Every structure is written in C-alpha cells, then in structure tokens.
C-alpha cells in the first residue's frame, strides 16, 4: 500500500535542471533529429520507460499538434486515447487563481484585501502574522503559510465534520492559528495557501470550488474535467504510477483509501483533464498574454501573470531559450503535468504523463522545452 505524497513543489529545481540539460543538446547533434510532437513524445516514453505520455502544441488560433502514446497501466494492454484524462496536480493552482480573479472583477473581492478583512469573524484569533496578508500575496506563495507538501503534515489536521464547504471553513480557521512555515512576504510554496484560497472563493461566490470551476471556467472553454484519480471506481482511464525505488514505476490503485487526495486541499491541485482540454486552458492564457483575453479583462490577466520574483498567481515566470516563459509543473506523486507558454513566439506546450516520479516529471519538462525550441 502506497501513501503518495501531496502536490510537490517541483517548479524551480526541475525547470532549472531541464534548462541546463537542454542547453546545446540539439545544436551539435551528429544527425538530423525529428522534433515533431509524436517523435519527441515517443523518445521520452521509451528512454524513461513511462507508461504513457500525452502532449499538445498550441498556437493562439488553434491546437496545432496533439498526440498520446503508451498504455493506461503498466502490465495491462489498454492503450491511452486522446479522450483519456491525466491528473494535473499543482497545475490546478492557475485555475483557482482565475476563479478568484473573476470574484475580483465582480467587486466581491480585491487583490489588496487582507485575511483579517476576509475572515472578520475570527480575525482576532488568527495569528498576527497572517492578518495583513493580502489575497494577491496568498496566490503568490508569500503568505508564510506552511507548505503542506508532505502527507505527514496532514496528521495534525483535526477531523472536521459537516458539509465539504463547512469542513473547509473550519480547516481555514484552524490553519490560520498555526505557526507560519516561513517569513511572511518571502516566497514559500504552499498547498495550504491555495487550500485557503479555495475557501475564500467559496465564501465570496457562495458555491463550492468544484461547481465554480466547472461552470465558470471549464464549461465556457468546452472542457469536461473531473476530480480525484481518473481511474477511480473502475473507470476505463489511466492509472497513476509511483516510484517504488531505484526508478521502478508501480501502478497506484486509484481506489486505495491511503492514496486519496485530501478534499480540503483540492483547490491546490486535484483535477484531471484530457490533453486536449488542458491545451484549451493553456490557449486561454496564451491568447491573453498576446492581447486577446477571454473570460477576464486584459488588465486582470496582466495582474495574474505579473511575477513577484519568479512566481505570479498560479504561474512561474522565467526565461527559457531566451524567451520569457510562463510555466508550471504539477505532480501528486503518480502523474505529472507540464505547461509552458511563450507568448512572444505564439506557442504553448503541454505534456502529461501517468508517472509521478521526479525523473518522469523532469523528462516531461525536457520534452516540453524541446518542443518549444522547435
């Protein structure tokens, strides 16, 4: 029985490693290399022994290329299809940020509203360090809230009762009484911060995070997504695979009670989409970065995409191959998701895999960088 990790903070270390690994990698190739999407995915699948991999190359006017390769589960014959879903992990954070931006545009929230103002009924009981944290700082991982990237951190969380929304509200009250994980104002990747952001969204909009993401974000984009593991309940979908040691990938039972994503943390990273649908989400942000916003105003998208240091709201921002790139990496230990956007070159790339080891996610990032370069 495998107790998988929570959504892991892969951004800085893995992207830096991928950038270094890609520098000059193809410039001195002794023979021509096929850089088409299917060829890049095929090499990645074979060289890293992945169960399956999916990817798309996106332009502002279309999804230019899309492909899936491999099997749903190691040791089983079923091949993946374009309609199969992959778990996104932390790449869901950008979606949660978009939903909060909608509340800001509606006038029900403000970027500079503090946690004390958002939760006035228990402002006096929350730790003083958190009272002045703004919504914007929360989404930029500068709240000081603990990371919550390890299942062991959840053992201290009480078993709250009530509806899902009531339990999330109680968890927010509890969380804001806990010691900070680091100095407020400094970058500290925090799943707890985005869990709290989900509570703020639910309070403001008067509906669950799950219903809001489906009706306000996915439906307008033509996306059909879900929550939890894609193959839960016997669904004919990809299984996730975890690293059992020495790089050996083992299927994770999607119905194992010890392997479920905590619903309190769902806004931080628990949703699954097909590669085509995730490409549609990437295209939304590519078009916005190129001055063609949908669902939100140009000014709001600019705010979402403006980095404080190297992280904006749900997006890392860093040069890749000489071009400013908005990116994110997500994994809850059994799947991996990569998105990279270069608006200056009118391109976005998404790569998904049903393996969650660090090697697998790094391989997916290498593939994405190769696709960006060609």
Located regions from the model:
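Bacterial Sec-dependent N-terminal signal peptides
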Residues: 19-36
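Short, glycine/proline-biased beta-turn/loop segments that scaffold the active-site neighborhood
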Residues: 110-126, 220-221
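Short, well-ordered beta-strand elements
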Residues: 328, 336-355
């Amino acid at each position: 029985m495998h107790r998988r990790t929570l959504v892991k903070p892969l951004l800085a270390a893995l992207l830096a490693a991928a950038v270094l690994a890609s520098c000059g990698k193809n410039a001195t190739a002794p023979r021509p290399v096929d850089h088409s999407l299917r060829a890049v995915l095929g090499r990645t699948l074979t060289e890293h022994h992945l169960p399956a991999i999916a990817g798309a190359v996106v332009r502002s006017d279309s999804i230019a290329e899309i492909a899936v390769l491999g099997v749903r589960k190691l040791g089983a014959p079923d091949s993946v299809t374009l309609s199969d879903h992959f778990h996104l992990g932390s790449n869901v954070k950008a979606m949660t940020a978009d939903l909060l931006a909608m509340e800001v545009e509606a006038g029900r929230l403000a970027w500079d509203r503090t946690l004390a103002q958002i939760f006035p009924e228990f402002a006096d009981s929350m730790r003083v360090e958190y009272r002045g944290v703004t919504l914007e700082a929360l989404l930029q991982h500068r709240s000081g809230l603990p990371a919550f990237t390890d299942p062991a951190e959840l053992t201290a969380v009480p078993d709250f009762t009530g509806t899902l929304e009531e339990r999330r509200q109680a968890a927010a009250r509890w969380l804001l009484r806990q010691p900070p994980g680091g100095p407020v104002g400094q970058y500290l990747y925090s799943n707890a911060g985005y869990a709290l952001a989900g509570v703020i969204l639910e309070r403001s909009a008067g509906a669950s995070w799950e219903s809001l993401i489906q009706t306000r974000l996915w439906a307008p984009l033509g996306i059909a997504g879900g929550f939890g593991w894609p193959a839960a309940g016997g669904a004919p979908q990809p299984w996730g695979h975890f690293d059992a040691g020495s790089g050996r990938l083992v299927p994770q039972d999607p119905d194992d009670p010890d392997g479920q994503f905590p619903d309190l943390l769902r806004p931080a990273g628990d949703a699954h989409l097909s590669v085509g649908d995730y490409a549609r989400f990437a295209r939304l942000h590519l078009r916005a970065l190129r001055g063609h916003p949908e669902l939100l105003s140009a000014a709001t998208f600019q705010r979402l995409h403006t980095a404080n240091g190297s992280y904006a709201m749900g997006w890392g921002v860093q040069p890749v191959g000489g071009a400013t790139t908005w990116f994110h990496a997500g994994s809850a230990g059994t799947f991996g998701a990569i998105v990279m956007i270069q608006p200056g070159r009118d391109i976005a790339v998404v790569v998904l895999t049903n393996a969650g080891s660090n090697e697998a996610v790094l391989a997916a990032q290498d593939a994405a960088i190769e696709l960006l370069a060609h």
